[in-house]
Amino acid sequence: MKKGGAIVNGNNYFPPQKEGRLYLSEGGTETELMYKYGFDLPQFALFPLLNNPDAVLKMGEMFRSYLEVAAKHKVSALIGGLDYRASPDWGELLGYSPEGLAEANLQSIEFIREIANEYASEIPGILVQGLVGPRGDAYERNENITENEAEDYHSVQLETLKKADVDLALAITFNNIPESVGVAHAAAKIGVPLGISLSLDSSSKLNSGPSLVEAITAIDKETDQSPEFYMINCSHPFEYEPAIEPDDWINRVRGVRPNASKMEKLALCKLGHLEEGDPVELGELCGNLARRYPHMDIWGGCCGTWNSHLDEIAKNVIVP
């Protein structure tokens, strides 16, 4: 179906993989707006910027630059990015009522759809995703949250994303098993397709301790494989490459959204400026991974990346 003119599936449906079809996602939206454009992001939240006309213009330019890359390389797009912090605890810290937070999340999705509409004839398929961030800080262990608490907590935002008719909810920068299981249970009950993107640290493991294979195996076991797929994000290839093995479980991993820099995450946060790394090298590393695992079909960027990085990634992951 078409929604707002952009080519999307709607009806909370995420399409199966199709040979030759690749998706390009957004880059590191928060770091780009903070350090490239100079906007303040309390609690690292983007959606409040929808109340700032200057920020709306810059965000429009930013998302168009991502979609221009998809159009240039003739790949599909899986686009989102304003609602990472649009969950109850973060909304309360930002001064939003539950009703106001839900409305802000709906406005975030509509903003993305309006931008996507401009590229409906240039990109072979545009899907819209809502981003579900962890309840706590992504760089903490977040070990205290239980599966049931996570299910209750994330149900709030997932209900809003279902109402927004997103093609996918992406639980992104998750770093422990119980919260991942809880958000998967919530999505399954509500009826929203869910991807889970896990973040690995410099030890090539989740910050809470398990390896990538241990986490995916455990989550799938507890959820009867209800997540549509898994991804890796907020990690540089030097961090996640040692965790990737040529075994059956890796087929559950459909994509990667790497950080631009090789620096350790906490050190990166303390820099106070944008660390863009080496976009050419990043693209080549992603290309190497794509050739080894051609089933991976979702590529994008995370902290420190923007359209230049996405261009290098897209150029390299398109396997002839």
Stretches found by the model and what they are:
Residues 2-320:
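Domain-level signal for soluble alpha/beta catalytic cores
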